[in-house]
A protein has these predicted regions:
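Non-catalytic signal-transmission and effector/linker regions of two-component phosphorelay proteins
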Residues: 1-10, 16, 75-76, 80, ...
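Hydrophobic/aromatic residues positioned on beta-strands within the core alpha/beta folds
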Residues: 86-88
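Two-component/phosphorelay signaling modules centered on CheY-like receiver
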Residues: 16-34, 106, 125
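A Lys-centered signature of the CheY-like receiver
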Residues: 109-111
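Acidic, metal-coordinating helix/loop segments flanking the phosphotransfer/catalytic sites
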Residues: 23, 35-54
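Acidic catalytic/metal-coordinating carboxylates
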Residues: 38-41, 63-70
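Active-site residues of response regulator receiver
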Residues: 58-59
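His-Asp phosphorelay/catalytic-motif detector in bacterial-type signaling
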Residues: 51-53, 76-84
Length: 134
């Protein structure tokens, strides 16, 4: 894993330990990282930070709003935002991923994910999006 990545990532994860690892992994790789502890704070951080390139979110979170519901709201605000869904229940994310199958801006990863792969996947998503015409 190289530490020469660039971009701003919003990490939305309710489990403090998982969130800390994700943030450290992405910062070490060179990304700027904004944290949120649930979908409500994720939506707020997204509205406050228009420079966000990608939302890396857990799918299942307490508090009523799931990562999928939050992602749908974010996509209404910015249809070009990149979203990486992380879940131990990948079938829960399949509906949104299937719906966006013709779009390169949504992907899913199974938990536990490999911390050596995620930064490269995110960098690849950002590079691909910046190469595509809007």
């Amino acid at each position: 894993m190289e530490n020469n990545k660039s971009g701003t990532i919003l990490v939305v994860e309710d489990e403090p330990g998982v969130r800390d690892v994700a943030v450290q992994m992405l910062e070490f790789a060179g990304f700027d990282v904004i944290e949120a502890v649930d979908a409500a704070s994720g939506l707020q951080r997204f509205k406050e930070n228009p420079q966000i390139d990608l939302v890396f979110t857990d799918v299942i979170m307490p508090g009523g709003t799931s990562g999928i519901e939050m992602s749908k709201e974010i996509l209404v605000q910015n249809p070009h935002i990149l979203i990486l869904l992380a879940t131990g229940y990948l079938d829960k994310a399949e509906a949104l991923i299937d719906k966006a199958a013709h779009s390169s801006n949504i992907a899913g990863v199974a938990k536990p994910y490999d911390i050596n792969i995620i930064p490269d996947l995110i960098s690849s998503m950002i590079s691909s999006a910046s190469a595509e015409p809007l």
